[in-house]
């Protein structure tokens, strides 16, 4: 897969249609909010009726690139993919790239959070509750050029989960320096500190500003 290194000149994203390579409504909402100041015309892979490709990469970046390449090839437009997940220190960084799969089909993140809690409980009371979210972004052009970015946010897991303003594992994650979970702090506060926001800051600085 093509990797873009910091020493190479970044390709700018020109005005026009940008296809968001996602079927996850929570992600789509956050991505559109982050892109809203730039006047891009966005449409999702779900809205275009595109299937989801098999994500068989061994990293967040690899899976984001698989999705972005698939959509760029199918649509002939620039595509942006997000692959993200929760990495728990005491679980050897699981669920990691399998974060969505832990939620099963159809996606049930209450079940996924319960599984994380059960796995940690099995480790014993001394198990670390440290965890971090990762967000990998892959921006792919129809000619195959790719720009990749990755953001992180560190914190601790809580149980029981709290809040109903997020999605995924948000209700069980409290970022360092905060007392509320990602599902309690609200969209604007989350946007200021999240892994997705960090990855987007890199993308915007490199390809849009």
From Swiss-Prot:
Gene3D superfamilies membership: 3.90.950.10
Positions annotated as active site in the UniProt record: 83 (proton acceptor)
Cofactor mode of binding and number, as noted: Binds 1 Mg(2+) ion per subunit.
Positions with a binding annotation for substrate: 22-27, 84, 167-170, 190, 195-196
CDD domains (alphabetical): HAM1 (cd00515)
GO cellular-component term (any): cytosol
Residue ranges of the TM segments: none
Names of the cofactor(s): Mg(2+)
Main enzyme class: hydrolase
Superkingdom: Bacteria
GO molecular function: dITP diphosphatase activity; ITP diphosphatase activity; metal ion binding; nucleotide binding; ribonucleoside triphosphate phosphatase activity; XTP diphosphatase activity
Any matching Pfam family: Ham1p_like
Reactions listed under catalytic activity: XTP + H2O = XMP + diphosphate + H(+); dITP + H2O = dIMP + diphosphate + H(+); ITP + H2O = IMP + diphosphate + H(+)
Family as reported in the entry's similarity comment: Belongs to the HAM1 NTPase family.
Role summary: Pyrophosphatase that catalyzes the hydrolysis of nucleoside triphosphates to their monophosphate derivatives, with a high preference for the non-canonical purine nucleotides XTP (xanthosine triphosphate), dITP (deoxyinosine triphosphate) and ITP. Seems to function as a house-cleaning enzyme that removes non-canonical purine nucleotides from the nucleotide pool, thus preventing their incorporation into DNA/RNA and avoiding chromosomal lesions.
Family annotation (HAMAP family): Non_canon_purine_NTPase
PANTHER family: INOSINE TRIPHOSPHATE PYROPHOSPHATASE, INOSINE TRIPHOSPHATE PYROPHOSPHATASE/HAM1 PROTEIN
Subunit field text: Homodimer.
Protein name: dITP/XTP pyrophosphatase
Source organism per UniProt: Zymomonas mobilis subsp. mobilis (strain ATCC 31821 / ZM4 / CP4)
């Amino acid at each position: 897969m093509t990797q873009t290194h910091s020493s190479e000149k970044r390709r700018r994203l020109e005005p026009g249609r940008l296809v968001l390579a996602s079927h996850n409504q929570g992600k789509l909402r956050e991505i559109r909010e982050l892109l809203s100041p730039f006047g891009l015309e966005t449409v999702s892979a779900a809205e275009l009726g595109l299937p989801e490709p098999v994500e068989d990469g061994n990293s967040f970046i690899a899976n984001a690139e698989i999705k972005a390449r698939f959509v760029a090839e199918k649509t002939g437009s620039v595509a942006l993919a997000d692959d993200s997940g929760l990495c728990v220190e005491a679980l050897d960084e699981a669920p990691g790239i399998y974060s969505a799969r832990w939620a099963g089909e159809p996606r049930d993140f209450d079940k996924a959070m319960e599984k994380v809690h059960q796995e940690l409980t099995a480790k014993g009371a001394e198990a670390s509750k440290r965890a971090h979210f990762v967000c990998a972004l892959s921006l792919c052009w129809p000619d195959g050029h790719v720009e990749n970015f990755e953001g992180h946010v560190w914190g601790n897991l809580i149980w029981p989960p709290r809040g109903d303003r997020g999605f995924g594992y948000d209700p069980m994650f409290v970022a360092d320096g905060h007392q509320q979970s990602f599902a309690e702090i609200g969209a604007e506060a989350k946007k200021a500190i999240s892994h997705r926001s960090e990855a987007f800051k890199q993308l915007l600085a490199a390809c849009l500003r």
